[in-house]
């Protein structure tokens, strides 16, 4: 996009910013504070260009009258959400899961003191995090089918499709040890 084109893009005024943040909070559960205004404006601008809509007010009207689970909301959510993830991300949390929860599960399994635990990966993006949990459960000597139920959800339909496919690029493995990668 050239300088002239970017100068012609509408600016998100205060009232429009409030209208969009309220709509996104109410319909999608996404929260945008004043510090995120620039990011929201740029991402909304992409949808305006894609749909050839001339103003934020017109786009807001379209969304306000659209079905919340409909195609345009799904497209907007895909535009707004950040989908940065990789295998074995958030090592400190995963270490705690293995040392505290998985160790206790393994001990209780011997006495059959409890059934499987449920782990929910909310905001799972393209699936690397829930798959990491299953890999670590296997490494800890657990049987994911017997000891563990892993649930994964994301607001982005596009990312959920990618998670179901289970195909990943090299960058998804940037923190994965060679041995684990070869094994799984």
Q: How would you label these PLM feature ranges?
A:
Residues 6-7, 14, 140, 150, ...:
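Intrinsic, short, N-terminal disordered tails of RNA polymerase sigma-factor systems
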Residues 2-120:
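Conserved AdoMet
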Residues 120-126:
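Aromatic-flanked redox-active Cys/Sec active sites in thiol-based oxidoreductases
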Residues 99, 103, 135-139, 165:
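Short, well-ordered alpha-helices that flank and scaffold nucleotide-derived cofactor binding pockets
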Residues 95, 131, 161:
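Alpha-helical elements of the RecA-like P-loop NTPase motor core of helicases
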Residues 126-143:
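Conserved SAM-binding loop of SAM-dependent methyltransferases across substrates and taxa
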Residues 122, 143-184:
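Extended basic-aromatic, gly/pro-enriched interface segments that bind polyanionic ligands
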């Amino acid at each position: 996009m050239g300088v002239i084109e970017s100068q012609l893009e509408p600016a998100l005024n205060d009232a429009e910013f409030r209208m969009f943040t309220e709509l996104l909070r109410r319909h999608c559960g996404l929260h945008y504070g004043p510090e995120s205004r620039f990011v929201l404006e740029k991402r909304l601008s992409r949808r305006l260009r894609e749909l050839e809509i001339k103003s934020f007010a017109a786009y807001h009207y379209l969304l306000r009258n659209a079905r919340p689970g409909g195609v345009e909301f799904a497209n907007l959510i895909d535009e707004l959400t950040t989908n940065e993830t990789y295998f074995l991300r958030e090592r400190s949390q995963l270490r705690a899961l293995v040392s505290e929860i998985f160790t206790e599960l393994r001990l209780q399994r011997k006495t059959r003191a409890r059934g499987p635990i449920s782990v929910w990966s909310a905001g799972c993006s393209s699936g690397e995090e829930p798959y990491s949990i299953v890999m670590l459960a296997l490494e800890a000597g657990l049987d994911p089918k017997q000891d563990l139920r892993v649930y994964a959800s994301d607001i982005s339909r596009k990312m959920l499709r990618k998670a179901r496919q289970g195909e990943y690029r090299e960058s998804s493995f940037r923190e994965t040890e060679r041995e684990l990668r070869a094994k799984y």
